[in-house]
């Protein structure tokens, strides 16, 4: 190994895992060969959690040339581990391509990107400040930028290549860059009781032909990327899992990284490939669109949009996990599974939020009965939510009083809107349901689940209305508004006893 070859991701500790209640860091080899010993990948960052799993899955797919069928996955589950020799052989064969620093082929980077006009490493993570971008959660600036450890830099590199939103670039003949492969979609990651189970739950059957991860193709050079010269079809599972969305060259300072060379990456050509972790919904025009996270609402409210009843397409990882769970139950094997929905909310090039939502994954979620119950439950919740929103507007109108509204957006309308939005009615209702939904979802296939959900809706609405009454006050106009609102609120609760309109 030459002096310029440094920090091999196969052996060096950089992937945080939970073992025996403690977080330790391991390399790719240990993570895969001892996956059964680790509870899970443990990181506060939902984006890191997603990309670390995608990297490990890419290595497994290529090392095992599969799985070719679900039976392969079930066999590895029964045996309690992956075949070790193929994994060791594969990692040894491509060992030189996993150095974070390398004169010719640094991992997921471009070796000849110039050092001039470097950017801070923090640009790799949406939650850290960089240049003129506003901070999301952190107040780091280029003046007080701490060094990233090699492990931090490696994880940040993976996050950026998968999640970088498109936007202005103006480097090396490229004015703007396109979205990284999963910059917009919600990602579905079923998880088991240890890292081995989690990887198996996401190891969707795979055909290795016409696919290659970044370490199996010749290293990219600046000349390949200038002027958006290199374009690849967005196809091939491991190609997409390890996509070089941007040209990056981490600049080693001997004990960490503060700056990097930065430029354009490989431009994606649209293709029919579906990322296994991504679901799709049908829009009003009959087009399939990727399912995204929303800044205003929790993901569960959009769950049914991906189900076949509504013309959507479930993420392949979710379908695979459901099928595997059924097989395990048939054999009397335990398989408690949860579902993690990961991703970011962005507006063009600006990242607004980073999310991880965790739900139980019920057996039989994709059965007709479960789909029907879920669709009805979400429709009930939305109808009551809309009713409460209208109620808040009516209460606000009664408090403000009727006035001449004039033309355009009058002060009256602004006052009315401000008061209605300040009432906690709708906000507290949805907040309560965020906590209630997982309990319903765990039993979604059961006949009684809708009755339980109605009670949850009723309880959430009642508590939200009580809080609204306390919030509004006891002035004469306020009491009159609440008295009028009480009748409307009673009508809304009465409708809960009726069957959902279909």
UniProtKB/Swiss-Prot annotation:
Keywords for the protein's UniProt record, in alphabetical order: Antiviral defense, Plasmid
A Pfam family matched in the record: CRISPR_Cse1
Keyword Ribosomal protein belongs to the record: no
GO BP: any one term: defense response to virus
Keyword Secreted: no
Record family assignment: Belongs to the CRISPR associated protein CasA/Cse1 family. Type I-E/Ecoli subfamily.
Subunit structure comment from the entry: Monomer. Part of the Cascade ribonucleoprotein complex. Interacts directly with the 5' end of crRNA, CasB, CasD and CasE. Binding of target ssRNA or dsDNA causes a conformational change in the Cascade complex; CasA is required for high affinity target DNA binding. Interacts with Cas3 once Cascade has recognized target DNA.
Function in brief: CRISPR (clustered regularly interspaced short palindromic repeat), is an adaptive immune system that provides protection against mobile genetic elements (viruses, transposable elements and conjugative plasmids). CRISPR clusters contain sequences complementary to antecedent mobile elements and target invading nucleic acids. CRISPR clusters are transcribed and processed into CRISPR RNA (crRNA).
Protein name: CRISPR-associated protein CasA/Cse1
Annotated gene: cse1
């Amino acid at each position: 190994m030459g002096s310029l070859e440094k920090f091999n991701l196969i052996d060096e500790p950089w992937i945080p895992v939970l073992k025996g209640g403690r977080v330790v860091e391991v390399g790719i080899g240990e993570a895969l060969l001892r996956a059964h010993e680790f509870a899970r990948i443990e990181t506060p960052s939902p984006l890191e959690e997603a990309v670390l799993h995608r990297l490990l899955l890419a290595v497994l797919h290529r090392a095992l040339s599969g799985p070719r069928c679900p039976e392969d996955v079930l066999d590895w589950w029964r045996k309690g581990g992956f075949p070790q020799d193929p994994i060791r052989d594969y990692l040894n064969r491509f060992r030189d391509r996993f150095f974070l620093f390398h004169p010719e082929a640094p991992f997921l980077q471009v070796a000849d990107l110039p050092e001039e006009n470097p950017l801070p490493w923090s640009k790799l993570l949406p939650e850290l400040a960089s240049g003129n971008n506003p901070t999301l959660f952190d107040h780091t600036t280029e003046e007080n930028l701490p060094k990233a450890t090699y492990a931090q830099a490696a994880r940040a590199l993976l996050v950026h290549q998968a999640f970088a939103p498109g936007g202005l670039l103006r480097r090396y003949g490229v004015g703007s860059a396109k979205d990284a492969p999963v910059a917009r979609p919600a990602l579905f990651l079923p998880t088991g009781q240890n890292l081995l189970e989690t990887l198996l739950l996401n190891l969707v059957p795979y055909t290795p032909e016409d696919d290659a991860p970044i370490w199996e193709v010749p290293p990219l050079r600046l000349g390949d990327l200038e002027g958006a010269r290199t374009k690849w079809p967005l196809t091939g599972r491991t190609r997409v899992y390890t996509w070089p969305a941007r040209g990056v060259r981490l600049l080693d300072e001997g004990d960490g990284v503060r700056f990097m060379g930065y430029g354009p990456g490989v431009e994606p050509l649209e293709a029919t490939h579906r990322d296994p972790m991504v679901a799709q919904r049908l829009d009003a025009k009959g087009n399939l669109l990727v399912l995204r996270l929303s800044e205003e609402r929790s993901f569960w409210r959009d769950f049914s949009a991906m189900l076949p009843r509504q013309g959507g397409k479930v993420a392949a990882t979710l379908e695979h996990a459901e099928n595997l769970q059924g097989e395990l139950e048939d054999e009397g094997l335990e398989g408690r599974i949860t579902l993690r929905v990961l991703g970011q909310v962005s507006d063009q090039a600006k990242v607004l939020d980073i999310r991880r939502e965790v739900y139980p994954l019920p057996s039989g979620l994709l059965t007709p009965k479960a789909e029907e119950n879920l669709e009805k439950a979400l429709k009930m919740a939305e109808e009551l939510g809309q009713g409460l929103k209208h109620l808040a507007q009516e209460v606000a109108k009664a408090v403000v009083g009727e006035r001449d509204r004039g033309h355009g957006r009058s002060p009256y309308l602004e006052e009315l809107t401000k008061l209605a939005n300040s009432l906690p009615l709708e906000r507290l209702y949805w907040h309560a349901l965020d906590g209630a939904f997982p309990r319903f979802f765990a039993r979604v296939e059961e006949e009684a689940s809708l009755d339980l959900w109605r009670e949850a809706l009723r309880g959430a609405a009642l508590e939200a209305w009580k809080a609204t009454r306390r919030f509004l006050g006891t002035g004469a106009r306020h009491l009159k508004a609440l008295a009028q609102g009480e009748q409307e609120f009673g009508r809304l609760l009465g409708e809960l006893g009726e069957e959902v309109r279909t």
